[in-house]
Amino acid sequence: MSSAAADHWAWLLVLSFVFGCNVLRILLPSFSSFMSRVLQKDAEQESQMRAEIQDMKQELSTVNMMDEFARYARLERKINKMTDKLKTHVKARTAQLAKIKWVISVAFYVLQAALMISLIWKYYSVPVAVVPSKWITPLDRLVAFPTRVAGGVGITCWILVCNKVVAIVLHPFS
């Protein structure tokens, strides 16, 4: 494919990239949750701790506080200690989960920015699409920026238009 033919399909390339980035942005929370589940195996330990606490509470309900106060108090302290340990564990896991989601989000937005910058760099002086200049007469210079081609649609304007159209189309799915 020649350079001229590649430039002819530039509008579709940019639209595809914008569409893909917006779809990925919608799927980002699900992907982050999946990755955090894959990277964290602590939920099994937490469920085991919850089961132990439940068993101890069950045992505590069978102990008479008046007759066996020492055993009752010891079991109650053990339950409190295990509950505190579980709370600490859950807080640590939640903090790690937030960190994983933040890293994935930042990585996505950095890649998206790099992609958009590379598209702007590639099509800076070439119009993404050329339309009859009378279609965009009052705004022709603004729409053509930075190409300065009469009737041309510049990359920055095209990215803005694509983002708006894709956002409207994908709104029901987000």
From Swiss-Prot:
The protein, known as: Guided entry of tail-anchored proteins factor 1
A GO cellular component entry from the record: nucleus
Classification lineage: Eukaryota, Metazoa, Chordata, Craniata, Vertebrata
Designated gene of the protein: GET1
Organism: Homo sapiens (Human)
Database matches in InterPro entries: Get1 (IPR028945), Helix_hairpin_bin_sf (IPR029012)
Gene Ontology MF, one: protein-membrane adaptor activity
Keywords: Coiled coil, Endoplasmic reticulum, Membrane, Transmembrane, Transmembrane helix
Record note on quaternary structure: Component of the Golgi to ER traffic (GET) complex, which is composed of GET1/WRB, CAMLG/GET2 and GET3/TRC40. Within the complex, GET1 and CAMLG form a heterotetramer which is stabilized by phosphatidylinositol binding and which binds to the GET3 homodimer. Interacts with CAMLG (via C-terminus). GET3 shows a higher affinity for CAMLG than for GET1.
Gene3D superfamilies for the chain: Helix hairpin bin (1.10.287.660)
Segments in the Lumenal topological domain: 1-8, 121-148
